[in-house]
Amino acid sequence: PKPYIMYTDVHGITWNDVRNKPDFGEAWPILAPVLEGADFLVAHNASFDKGVLYGCCEFYGLTPPDLPFRCTVQLARRVLNIRPAHLANVCRVLGLKLNHHEPLSDAQACAQIALAALRAAP
């Protein structure tokens, strides 16, 4: 990782948090097998996350996962009829705990939204 971390004010990740951690190119071979057997990836505002993932893979000369993305913004709007569909509001409406922009909390909330949409889908 490089010492300049964008959006620290949003996600709270600092240089001290990552200075001795692997960069994406080193981490991907460890992370990619976790996706084996997955049918899809889920993200809140999936087009953004897909762009970041594909951009990182391209930068490091890696093959991105060949998986469709499901967007919990769209699921919240279309299946759960929640508006506005930003993460904090969807969590509030569904009664989900959220420490917004803390990566694990955001990921867990996203998974819970996807599960709620699956349960509610006709």
Q: What is the predicted function of each stretch?
A:
Residues P1-D66, N81-P84, A88-H101:
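Conserved non-catalytic scaffold segment of RNase H-like nuclease domains
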Residues T8, T72, C110:
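Ser/Thr-centric signal marking residues that sit
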Residues T63-A76:
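Conserved beta-strand -> loop -> alpha-helix junction used to position metal-binding or nucleic-acid-contacting
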Residues D106:
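Conserved catalytic/binding loops enriched for acidic/polar residues
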Residues A111-P122:
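Acidic two-metal-ion nuclease catalytic site recognized across multiple nuclease folds
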